């Protein structure tokens, strides 16, 4: 109220503006419709998948391919995705939106490369660790009957292979939202869901005890196809992303992870077997195997000169040296 007189004397005249044009509500409404439609498609695929698992369980009650088994496998799968990929991409999203607002393709390219590289430093090793530690790991976390272990462990392993494609799918969503391109997000979701449903149909071709593995494979392959399709589209939109550098980093990380996974598998499963089914054996195999995998991976990262891993590791080592 105190500012009314000074503003009037300064020449300010308030004129009410009627209507809702010019506020960006139209663009917001359009992207909301596209996004909601994509969400409906994704949820539809989830409902179909769970209906199919329920049918298998109903017809073959002796198998362990239940919805609860899928939920348990997905819970383990989502841990690294939630802590690593989602955290990094959430931090990148405001900068991606700013790059789009500024019309800077070069900034967007740089941010996309960061989104493809930074999570991969931990996600690719986590993928291989999930594969080799799946069996003792699920027995450590869940109370399972002997007949339930194999199916759940295989599902976790297959899902683990798809950690990177799932992360790329998350980056694709952030990219589309930053560009206010809900239509592209819907198209990518339709592609992913279509591939997933096609693979899910094969559930009735394989023996019923493999139903859960088929669901895991459908998720992994669908996300892989969707990730590749989006990378092609984004590369065309931005005039290239620089995937050569990204692929070289992924290859080095995969080599280091695979080499570290072999002795880890032998040690972890050896300790697990020595426990004769006791929880201590499962937990010991998982814990010691996990520590061994991390140690071997870091040594191999140094040998292969994976600079990005060393850049993350060196500050932590310096802090530890100072404290000691």
Regions of interest found by a model, annotated:
Residues 1-324:
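Membrane-embedded alpha-helical bundles of multi-pass transporters/translocases
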């Amino acid at each position: 109220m105190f500012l009314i007189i000074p503003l009037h004397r300064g020449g300010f005249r308030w004129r009410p503006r009627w209507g809702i044009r010019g506020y960006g509500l139209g663009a917001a409404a359009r992207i909301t419709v596209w996004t909601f439609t994509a969400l409906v498609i994704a949820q539809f695929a989830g409902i179909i998948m769970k209906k199919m698992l329920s049918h298998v369980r109903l017809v073959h009650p002796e198998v362990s391919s239940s919805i609860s088994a899928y939920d348990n496998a997905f819970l383990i799968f989502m841990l690294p995705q939630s802590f690593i990929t989602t955290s990094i991409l959430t931090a990148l999203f405001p900068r991606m939106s700013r790059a789009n607002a500024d019309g800077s393709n070069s900034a967007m390219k740089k941010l996309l490369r960061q989104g493809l590289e930074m999570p991969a430093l931990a996600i690719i090793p986590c993928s291989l660790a999930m594969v080799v530690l799946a069996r003792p790991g699920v027995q450590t976390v869940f109370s399972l009957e002997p007949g339930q272990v194999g199916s759940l462990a295989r599902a976790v392993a297959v899902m683990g292979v798809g950690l990177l494609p799932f992360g790329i799918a998350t980056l694709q969503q952030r990219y589309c939202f930053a560009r206010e391109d809900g239509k592209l997000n819907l198209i990518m979701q339709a592609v992913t869901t279509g591939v997933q449903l096609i693979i899910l149909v094969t559930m009735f071709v394989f023996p019923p005890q493999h139903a859960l593995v088929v669901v895991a494979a459908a998720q992994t392959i669908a996300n892989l196809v969707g990730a590749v399709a989006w990378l092609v589209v984004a590369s065309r939109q931005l005039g290239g992303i620089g995937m050569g550098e990204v692929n070289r980093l992924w290859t080095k990380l995969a080599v280091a992870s695979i080499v570290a996974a072999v002795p880890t598998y032998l040690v972890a499963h050896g300790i697990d077997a020595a426990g004769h089914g006791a929880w201590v054996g499962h937990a010991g195999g998982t814990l010691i195997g996990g520590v061994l995998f991390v140690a071997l991976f870091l040594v191999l990262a140094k040998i292969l000169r994976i600079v990005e891993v060393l850049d993350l590791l060196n500050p932590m080592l310096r802090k530890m040296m100072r404290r000691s």
